[in-house]
Regions:
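N-terminal pre-Walker A segment at the start of P-loop NTPase domains
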Residues: 1-16
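Walker A (P-loop) phosphate-binding motif
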Residues: 14-65, 77, 154-155
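Conserved NTP-binding/hydrolysis module of P-loop NTPases
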Residues: 70-80
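Switch II (G3) loop of P-loop NTPases
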Residues: 103-117
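Conserved ATPase-coupling elements of RecA-like P-loop NTPase cores
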Residues: 114-120, 143-146
């Protein structure tokens, strides 16, 4: 029963979030995925665009519930039952009261599982980016992917787990339209592979001098 209620809430919020997005029908959505670096990338893109365009960014919202809430301009306070009731009541009202305009929506798209609603397919049912950034894939949030790998050898298991995670994240890139743009980290072999499958135009970045954007120096903070 608890699971059914949870799914109802997600579908409910998604319904109103998609209606809300239609108010900005000319908005270009930029999706960002990867096991690490999503927030930094979001901040960098936001800094570049904000002085010339109206930009909305999904701060602290990259999940199956967080993205819908962010689109509706709603935030959870303490995730109590009363808090959920509050956002459920406010969601339809936002269609009448929330008219924020933006040219770009930068959204982090984090996945924890190959299964809905915590997978990329569900996030893509909320937003359909025209531009996407795929940063990397590693074992962060890998628990739900364990069932996909039968190998017990630690090295083989790790490699296959990372590939399974990358495959799920890559759905963002594969969903792009022909007039879409994919920005791929060619330093990550699993990310680089997706360039052969996407319909969109690919721009590469990385340390190799053959990349469209070569990174020659970086600083870790």
């Amino acid at each position: 029963m608890k699971q059914k209620i949870g799914l109802f809430i997600l579908y409910y919020l998604r319904f109103f979030a998609k209606l809300q997005l239609k108010k900005n029908k000319n908005c270009k959505i930029i999706g960002i995925t990867g096991s690490a670096g999503k927030s930094s990338t979001r901040n960098a893109i936001y800094s570049v665009l904000k002085n010339k365009y109206l930009v909305k960014a999904s701060f602290k919202a990259n999940s199956e519930s967080g993205i819908s809430l962010d689109i509706l301009g709603l935030e959870m306070n303490n995730y109590s039952i009363l808090d959920w009731l509050r956002v459920l009541i406010l969601a339809p009202l936002r269609l009448l009261t929330y008219f924020k305009k933006f040219d770009y929506y930068i959204v982090e798209m984090g996945i924890d599982s190959p299964n809905p609603p915590k997978n990329m397919d569900f996030l893509l049912s909320i937003v359909q980016p025209k531009m996407a950034v795929f940063l990397n894939a590693n074992l962060n949030h890998s628990f739900a992917f364990d069932q996909l790998v039968a190998d017990t050898d630690p090295v083989l298991r790790k490699d296959k787990l990372v590939k399974a995670i990358a495959k799920e994240k890559a759905k963002l890139i594969l969903s792009l339209p022909k007039n879409g743009f994919a920005f791929l980290n060619f330093d990550d072999a699993n990310v680089k592979e997706t360039c052969q499958e996407t319909k969109g135009l690919v721009y590469s970045f990385g340390s190799n001098n053959l990349c469209d954007l070569q990174i020659t120096k970086h600083q870790t903070q």
